[in-house]
Amino acid sequence: MRSDMIKKGFDKAPHRSLLKATGLKDEDFHKPFVAICNSFIEIIPGHKHLNEFGRLVKEAVRAAGMVPFEFNTIGVDDGIAMGHIGMRYSLPSREIIADSVETVVNAHWFDGMICIPNCDKITPGMMMAAMRINIPTVFVSGGPMAAGKTSKGEVVDLSSVFEGVGAYQSGKISEEELKDIEDHGCPSCGSCSGMFTANSMNCLCEVLGLALPGNGSILATDSRREQLIQRAAESLKILMERDIKPRDIVTEEAIDDAFALDMAMGGSTNTVLHTLAIAQEAGLDYDMNRIDAVSRKVPHLCKVSPASNWHMEDIDRAGGMSAILKELSRKEGVLHFDRITVTGKTLRENIADAEIQDKEVIHSLENPHSQEGGLRILKGNLAKDGAVIKSGATEVKRFEGPCVIFNSQDEALAGIMLGKVKKGDVVVIRYEGPRGGPGMPEMLAPTSAIAGMGLGADVALLTDGRFSGASRGISVGHISPEAAAGGEIALLQQGDIVCIDVEERLLEVKVSDEELAKRRKEWKRPEPKVKTGWLGRYAQMVTSANTGAVLKMQNFD
């Protein structure tokens, strides 16, 4: 066993003595040591119940004849961090989580690991760590919350609250109506109830094969979550016996299948960023061109909030991820059926008995929302290395208009609220990428303000920053190269005509190459917004969004 490094031999007497101080007995040194990587944090609704989850996981691990050791990671609630400097810490927290999990697990030579994530950066951070460490690992997430209902019976979620701010600002609803939405938008523990980033990543974790079927859609408050916990411990034991590790599971084909699901369900654009980072940690050469190839052959089968009024509970009722995959399996050349998963079985075996229970929620291949995926990769003279749009969250497929430029999210939100943006405009928010932000903050407040003011179909938004999974409308993010790296978005001038063509996958400014070259000679890189602390270090080391915004390593050759 890997853990023999800290428990076998006379020279490990000091190690055993310390371990006995934690409650271990002599017989425990003959059993596998399992890291329980939890993320219990009281300020995050998606994590406030994970203390109890951790207790249940430890019980299940002990019952399976193994020795559990629980530890916690940090986390950031993106919704609470929205609209202030806290959002700059969100994406960088992913790297801290990955580093901290790697540190604890490798310092103590665990034999296996069960990860308990749930919300935005915590799930991908743990997945990145699992790729690095590469010991048998099972993920069991905290689960989504249910949608809320206002006093009038209207179904609401967190995106409703954000959009309610814009609606109140423009006089469309009263203060009392906004308070009603606020009081009911997030009714319980769990990750926010739409197809936002947290739920998107937990669904992808399931399809990659790192989590059990049901992980992405079973509600946090559903008793079936406890059954998942029990099965997770049993599955880990099988993985350890068969020496099946994360890198055996997360192959290029597995990532293809994860993106196939992502396209079919119209997941968050952040899935692109995080999955590219996970691929890098797994040592895979996976890029945005391959994502685009998947998008072109996968139909969009289900729309979930913010693209519709359906929520994760509806997806679960309709059959969950397995039902979506089973429907996709009817189309030749989309899925890779014979790859292994944490169940110890293949994807084919995992979805064999699945079927769609409600075709209003999950459409059939014969009746898709569109023939191509709900996420698309755009390129052009404004995004030579790519950009991402959640095409399933807008009916507008082509938009052209003059750009209104803001050099920060705060500046943009103020401008939108002051009426500086009108119908037909293309809002550009730049210098908010991984390096320029720093931290590539989400633009949920501006997109929600635009939608809340009734301009969602009439105003486009471009940024080198990110979008929340709760964002909708004509929103193009992850523009690479970013402005702070000298990308073409930095060369835009007020009033330039920008064209977004979703069908042709184009993002262009109607300016000649000669004019752009002239502007580049005149461009000067702005001073970094942050020069000290963790964010200062992050800004110096982070790569662009098209490579997952991972930290670049120094070349020691």
From Swiss-Prot:
The annotation note on the cofactor reads: Binds 1 [2Fe-2S] cluster per subunit. This cluster acts as a Lewis acid cofactor.
Positions carrying N6-carboxylysine are K121
Query: Keywords assigned by UniProt?
Result: 2Fe-2S, Amino-acid biosynthesis, Branched-chain amino acid biosynthesis, Iron, Iron-sulfur, Lyase, Magnesium, Metal-binding
What is the enzyme's main class? lyase
Which EC number applies? 4.2.1.9
Query: Which reaction is recorded as catalysed by this protein?
Result: (2R)-2,3-dihydroxy-3-methylbutanoate = 3-methyl-2-oxobutanoate + H2O; (2R,3R)-2,3-dihydroxy-3-methylpentanoate = (S)-3-methyl-2-oxopentanoate + H2O
Q: Where is [2Fe-2S] cluster bound in this sequence?
A: C119, C192
Q: Which residues bind Mg(2+)?
A: D78, D120, K121, E442
Q: Where is the active site?
A: S468
GO BP terms: isoleucine biosynthetic process; L-valine biosynthetic process
| Pathway as given in its UniProt record | Amino-acid biosynthesis; L-isoleucine biosynthesis; L-isoleucine from 2-oxobutanoate: step 3/4; Amino-acid biosynthesis; L-valine biosynthesis; L-valine from pyruvate: step 3/4
Q: Tell me if Amino-acid biosynthesis is a UniProt keyword of this record.
A: yes
- A single Gene Ontology molecular function, please? 2 iron, 2 sulfur cluster binding
**Cofactor requirement:** [2Fe-2S] cluster; Mg(2+)
The subunit field of the Swiss-Prot or TrEMBL record says: Homodimer.
Family label? Belongs to the IlvD/Edd family.
Q: What does this protein do?
A: Functions in the biosynthesis of branched-chain amino acids. Catalyzes the dehydration of (2R,3R)-2,3-dihydroxy-3-methylpentanoate (2,3-dihydroxy-3-methylvalerate) into 2-oxo-3-methylpentanoate (2-oxo-3-methylvalerate) and of (2R)-2,3-dihydroxy-3-methylbutanoate (2,3-dihydroxyisovalerate) into 2-oxo-3-methylbutanoate (2-oxoisovalerate), the penultimate precursor to L-isoleucine and L-valine, respectively.
From the Swiss-Prot or TrEMBL record, give the protein name: Dihydroxy-acid dehydratase
The gene name reads ilvD
